[in-house]
Structures are given as structure tokens and as C-alpha cells.
């Protein structure tokens, strides 16, 4: 059968039947050196992400099927976390089924979904090295707004001790034991940064339960006011909340500082505190997943010896 759009079926996800096929498609895309929407692709990861974002498969996820033989050739997903006004779209098309309009047809369906939810805009990302993906999102009216940057460094690199300005201090969640502080820290420490969401206790409860309280570090100002947060995780992707390796991989998870306290010096001290907290657990590497950090913060990470593994440009389309 010839490969044409008219020979394909577009429908919403049947989770029980389609999920293994979605995983197979995303693995094919990832093996082609392209963004699969997840750092680790598995049935567990895709299913957990869907539950975390409260996706309704009958409205939020589209699949595209060819019939000779039966093959899943396209996947489109609408993610909206809690009450965040900027939903994120992901579109993946099988490498052998491109240039047929599948991606454009999925964009139309996901944009319609966003309009039904009265969203004023939608976001997506594209790896800056993938020119076809960049051209696709620009052609569909998206404009660059920020970036996701994954940085890494060998754990035996050697790190200076953290130096905080006078009066600033760190306390763990185990010491404070109040989920409201966790919520406030996550809502305020990334304020104004792309991809960081304003959540409720209900939104963060599931994620919070996966993090040991002694690995959550709060930054306090001299007057006792909350000033920031970071976390130290082993073998758990900061962005996906799943085990990512059988080797000990450390994540200095998203140092965040409340806007009125922000300075490169505080970000540096907070990062180094998290790194030194990880080192006794003997990780092979230390990773940072930066979502929307300022250029001077990224530059500071690199001055410490971190190198960029991957950078995805974030785009937004106004509806």
C-alpha cells in the first residue's frame, strides 16, 4: 500500500491496546537520535507521566496507525500540569513515515484540544541540533522563548566547597517536616522560569512522596525567610521521577532561588551544596537538568566544569 495520509487512521489512545505500540514508536524515534519526549522510554515511564499530568487519553493523546501491516506511525500528546496556563505538546512521527503531513495533522488536533481548554498558548521543545524539527515548529507558528539544558560532570572532577553569603543557611526537609514549605519553595524558587509550574498540595503530593526528606535542601535568608531549594537524587531522573541507570548517577536537581534573592553566587553555593551532599553516595557522574535558567547561571555551571550534553530550545505559539 502506498504511503499517503488518506491511508492512515487518526484516533485517541486506547491505553490498554496502544501503549506498547507507543513505546515501540518512541524507542524507534530515540534510536534515530531524536527526541522521544522522555529520557528513558518504557511502558512504565510513559504511563507514569500520563498519570502525573492527569492526562485523559480520550482527549489528550492521539495515535496514527497504518494498516498494511498494522503499524503505529505517529503520536501526539497534550500535557497540562495542574492549573499551568502553558500546556506542552509533543509530536513524534516514525522516521520512515515523514513528509506526508502526519505531524501537521497532529498539530491541528492538539491545537484544537488546547482551544477547547481555553488555553492562550502552547509550548513545545526541539533539539537545537535537529534542523528538521526546528524548521517544523517554526513553520507552525512557534517562536523560541527559553531552553532545557542537560549538563554533566564526572563525580571525581573535584569541587570547591559551597560558600554562602553571611547569614544564609541550609535545612533539610527532614528537619522541617512540612509539605507546605516544599510547595512554597517549588512555587516561588523558579518563579518566572519557563517550564516550572505553580502547583497545589494535590499536584505535588505524588512527586514529593518519591523524594527522601533528607535529600531536600531548603535555603534560608538571614532573617529566616525561605530563599531557595535544591535536591540531591541518585539514579532518579529529576524531570521524570524514574530510575534511569544501574550505575549510581547523581542529580543535583534544579537549584532554585526566590527572585528577590537571586544572584550567581547563591546559585553557585546552592549547587555545590547539593553536589557535596551527593558525593558520599559515590555517584559516577553528577547531572543537572536546567529548565529555563538564565544564561549567566548556565555559564557558571560550565565554569565549574559541567559540560552540555543536550540542549532543547523551548518554543511557544500564541493561539
Go through each PLM region and give its residues.
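Short amphipathic alpha-helix that is part of the acyltransferase structural core
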Residues: 1-49, 163-197
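Acyl-donor-binding surface of acyltransferase catalytic domains
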Residues: 1-6, 80-86, 94-167, 312-318
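Conserved donor-binding loop and adjoining core beta-sheet/short helix segment
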Residues: 11-12, 16, 26-128, 227-253
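Hydrophobic adenine-recognition pocket in adenosine-nucleotide-binding enzymes
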Residues: 93, 255-257, 290
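Conserved acetyl-CoA-binding loop-helix of GNAT-fold acetyltransferases
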Residues: 99-112, 254-257, 263-280, 299-303
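Active-site/acyl-donor-binding loops of N-acyltransferases
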Residues: 139-159, 272-319
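Phosphate-binding active sites in nucleotide-utilizing proteins
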Residues: 190-222, 226-235, 255
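Extended hydrophobic-aromatic, low-complexity segments
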Residues: 193-195, 219, 227-230, 238-248, ...
Amino acid at each position: 500500500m502506498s504511503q499517503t495520509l488518506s491511508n492512515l487512521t487518526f484516533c485517541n489512545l486506547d491505553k490498554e491496546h496502544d501503549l506498547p505500540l507507543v513505546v515501540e514508536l518512541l524507542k524507534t524515534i530515540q534510536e534515530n537520535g531524536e527526541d522521544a519526549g522522555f529520557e528513558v522510554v518504557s511502558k512504565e515511564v510513559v504511563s507514569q507521566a500520563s498519570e502525573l499530568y492527569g492526562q485523559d487519553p480520550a482527549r489528550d493523546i492521539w495515535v496514527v496507525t497504518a494498516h498494511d501491516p498494522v503499524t503505529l506511525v505517529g503520536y501526539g500528546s497534550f500535557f497540562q500540569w495542574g492549573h499551568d496556563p502553558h500546556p506542552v505538546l509533543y509530536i513524534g512521527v516514525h522516521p520512515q513515515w515523514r513528509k506526508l503531513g502526519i505531524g501537521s495533522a497532529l498539530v491541528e488536533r492538539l491545537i484544537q484540544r488546547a482551544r477547547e481548554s481555553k488555553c492562550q498558548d502552547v509550548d513545545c521543545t526541539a533539539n537545537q541540533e535537529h534542523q528538521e524539527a526546528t524548521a517544523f515548529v517554526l513553520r507552525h507558528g512557534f517562536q523560541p522563548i527559553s531552553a532545557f539544558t542537560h549538563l554533566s560532570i564526572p563525580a571525581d572532577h573535584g569541587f570547591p566547597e559551597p560558600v554562602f553569603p553571611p547569614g544564609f543557611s541550609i535545612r533539610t526537609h527532614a528537619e522541617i517536616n512540612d509539605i507546605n514549605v516544599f510547595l512554597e519553595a517549588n512555587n516561588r524558587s523558579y518563579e518566572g522560569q519557563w517550564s516550572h509550574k505553580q502547583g497545589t498540595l494535590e499536584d505535588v503530593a505524588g512527586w514529593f512522596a518519591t523524594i527522601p526528606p533528607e535529600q531536600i535542601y531548603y535555603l534560608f535568608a538571614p532573617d529566616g525567610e525561605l530563599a531557595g531549594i535544591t535536591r540531591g537524587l541518585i539514579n532518579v531522573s529529576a524531570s521524570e521521577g524514574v530510575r534511569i541507570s544501574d550505575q549510581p548517577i547523581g542529580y543535583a536537581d534544579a537549584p532554585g532561588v526566590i527572585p528577590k534573592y537571586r544572584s550567581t553566587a547563591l546559585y553557585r553555593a546552592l549547587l555545590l551544596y547539593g553536589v557535596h551532599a551527593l558525593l558520599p553516595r559515590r555517584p559516577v557522574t553528577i547531572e543537572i537538568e536546567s529548565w529555563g535558567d538564565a544564561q549567566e547561571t548556565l555559564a557558571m555551571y560550565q565554569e565549574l566544569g559541567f559540560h552540555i550534553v543536550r540542549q532543547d530550545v523551548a518554543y511557544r505559539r500564541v493561539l
